[in-house]
Design a protein with these regions (language model features):
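Short hydrophobic clusters on alpha-helical segments that form packing/core surfaces
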Residues: 17-25, 67, 71, 96, ...
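C-terminal peripheral helix-coil segments that are non-catalytic and often amphipathic
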Residues: 1-2, 95-98, 142, 146-158, ...
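Amphipathic alpha-helical segments used for helix-helix packing
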Residues: 101-131, 182-187
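Short, Lys/Arg-enriched C-terminal cap helix and immediately downstream tail that follows
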Residues: 61-62, 72, 181
Length: 229
């Protein structure tokens, strides 16, 4: 007679390895663990990992591909045409924050890439098919950049935003968010962020974006025109 319990499908070993590596990176950092640390909780020996991946770097590149796939879906167009571009961008930036908070290992891998622009191993760069200045045109992130550019252009045509280079805008919001997540400490990554912390992070990012896109370059943090002294 059926027990009534649903069977949970066992993940392939390759996926289990990637999941454990993701957990370790979030907790210990990109260089804070060994393959033995990965193998132990899975109940396997290190040679078993080499049946699926050529090296530790190969594991990290494959994990990066997983994150790049998720990142490629950011800044999607509004489901309904005619929606206010500013409201859509605000919502997409909130989702951008959620993506980073939900994937702390991705944040740490991003910081490694920024820290090794030449030399070293740039895992996300390899996974995305090239350096950041090339990804708007090639590779899996091209669609994300295309959607962001279209959203910014819609805001410009609606008289909401000034004209900006989409990649410049992306670099600004990305950099501000990374700094917000790790400075002064990385408690937003290692712990469970409170609703207040999440709301403050989203508010900060939207404020930066709003000021950068403002038609009036003298717009201050309160949305008012700064007085020249």
């Amino acid at each position: 007679m059926p027990s009534g319990r649903r069977r949970v499908a066992k993940l392939p070993t390759r996926s289990l390895i990637l999941n454990e590596v993701e957990r370790l990176i979030a907790r210990k950092g990109v260089y804070g663990f060994t393959l033995q640390d990965v193998a132990g909780p899975l109940g396997v020996q290190v040679p078993a990992i080499y049946k699926h991946f050529k090296s530790r770097d190969d594991v990290l590149i494959e994990l990066s591909r997983r994150f790049i796939e998720g990142l490629s879906r950011q800044f999607a167009p509004a489901p309904r045409s005619g929606r206010d571009p500013a409201a859509t961008l605000k919502r997409r930036l909130e989702e951008f924050v959620d993506f980073h908070l939900d994937n702390p290992a991705y944040v740490r891998l991003s910081l490694v890439d920024f820290a090794t622009p030449e030399g070293g191993m740039e895992y996300l760069t390899l996974a995305s098919g090239g350096p950041l200045h090339e990804t708007p045109h090639i590779g899996p992130l091209a669609s994300m950049h295309r959607h962001l550019a279209a959203l910014l252009d819609a805001g410009r045509k609606a008289g909401k935003f000034r004209e900006v280079v989409a990649l410049d805008f992306y670099l600004i919001v990305k950099s501000v968010l990374l700094i917000r997540l790790v400075f002064r400490n990385d408690s937003l990554l290692t712990g469970e962020p409170t609703p207040v912390q999440v709301a403050e992070t989203k508010s900060t990012l939207w404020d930066v974006a709003r000021r950068y896109l403002a038609l009036n370059p003298n717009l201050n943090i309160n949305g008012r025109t700064s007085k020249r002294r």
